[in-house]
Amino acid sequence: MRVVLDGVRPWRHDLAGCLHACLGTLVEHAGFAPLEVLGASWQFYYRLGDLRSEEYYFPCPDGRSLVASLAPGHPIGSRWHLPADAEQGWQQVRRQILAGTPVAVAVDNFELPFRPAYQDVHSNHLVVVHGFDDERQSARVLDAIPPFFAGVLPLAVLAAARDSGNRSSH
């Protein structure tokens, strides 16, 4: 089976990183204007003592989901999935794509051949997965952060990037 979702477009703002870029792509696909949605909560908030390694970390001030915190007043939310293994993780992503929803996926730049940190530096990052080809064992990936990437990754590469030794805490 081969599926590529229509209408998944890259979104990026110069003042934002991979978190906002991925969410901009996802909220636009859901029919919202990314800058209006994400700009509603454009702020700097820091929870004292809460240090994380994820580039995309955003402390949610009142326990709301990440997306609900970034997009107050909009009927959207998010949920982190922590799969038991790479296969379970891929099946979760695949199900969402089959349902018509692109997925933000946490990865390690060290394992992604299109990232400048490839095989050099471990760094948590987010990309959007919006398609797959079962026969070719590949996924369609979008990364609006320079250097821009919109293309096909072998599932083995995506699995390595999702399951690297670079641990994160969401």
Where are these regions (language model features)?
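Noncatalytic regulatory segments and standalone regulatory/sensor domains
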Residues: D133-H170
